[in-house]
Amino acid sequence: MATKLTERQQEILDLIRQTVARTGFPPTRAEIAQALGFRSPNAAEDHLKALARKGAIELTAGASRGIRLKDAEPTPSPILASLSQLLLPLVGRVAAGSPILAAEHVEREVGVDPSLFSQAPDYLLKVRGMSMRDAGILEGDLLAVKKSSEARNGQIIVARLGDDVTVKRLQRHGSRIELLPENPEFSPILVAPDDEFALEGVAVGLIRTHALH
């Protein structure tokens, strides 16, 4: 890092690292403000901009979780991954009714450093659309997914609803399931009791596609 950080900036950077390690995703401005006792998210935004100017993080405009640690970017994967890397199938478009990891969906294998993720993922899913923009998940990103049929309230999940596979935030209200986007331009999805719904996995991290070029 080229420029020395202030004590407060270092606290924020440590909080971002801890949140990414625990959840796989960076905190929002409001979460930073609450954790560090700021009076408003605007104060957190000012510190984040200072961290970006000093080269510690990269900010994505318009996304509440659009924070990326500059020192956590994975290196380009070689043809043969090193022993320290994890080879993960990269899943592109998923055909209706077929398993996510069916051979025809796997575009290639990508070598990644497992320490980048909160848990070891089982595959990478290419993100399509901008419904999770405010969680910092953008079109073309690679979402690291751990296969699971269970998830906690508030976790970002990969779910199959009918013939579609979608990435959303899980919200349960008793027996009712709602799939929440992170973009006000998209509407929540209420899962009806007779819908064909299956939880395919939980998100444990994210790779920006430019890191693989």
From Swiss-Prot:
Enzyme Commission number, as recorded: 3.4.21.88
UniProt superkingdom: Bacteria
One example GO MF annotation: DNA binding
Positions of the catalytic residues: S131 (for autocatalytic cleavage activity), K168 (for autocatalytic cleavage activity)
Catalytic activity: Hydrolysis of Ala-|-Gly bond in repressor LexA
DNA-binding residue intervals: 29-49
UniProt entry keywords in alphabetical sequence: Autocatalytic cleavage, DNA damage, DNA repair, DNA replication, DNA-binding, Hydrolase, Repressor, SOS response, Transcription, Transcription regulation
Sites annotated Cleavage: A96, G97
GO biological process terms held by the UniProt record: DNA repair; DNA replication; negative regulation of DNA-templated transcription; proteolysis; SOS response
CDD domains the UniProt entry points to: S24_LexA-like
Subunit comment: Homodimer.
Cited function: Represses a number of genes involved in the response to DNA damage (SOS response), including recA and lexA. In the presence of single-stranded DNA, RecA interacts with LexA causing an autocatalytic cleavage which disrupts the DNA-binding part of LexA, leading to derepression of the SOS regulon and eventually DNA repair.
Family: Belongs to the peptidase S24 family.
PANTHER family referenced in this protein's UniProt entry, alphabetically: LEXA REPRESSOR (PTHR33516), LEXA REPRESSOR-RELATED (PTHR33516:SF2)
Protein name, UniProt field: LexA repressor
Gene responsible for this protein: lexA
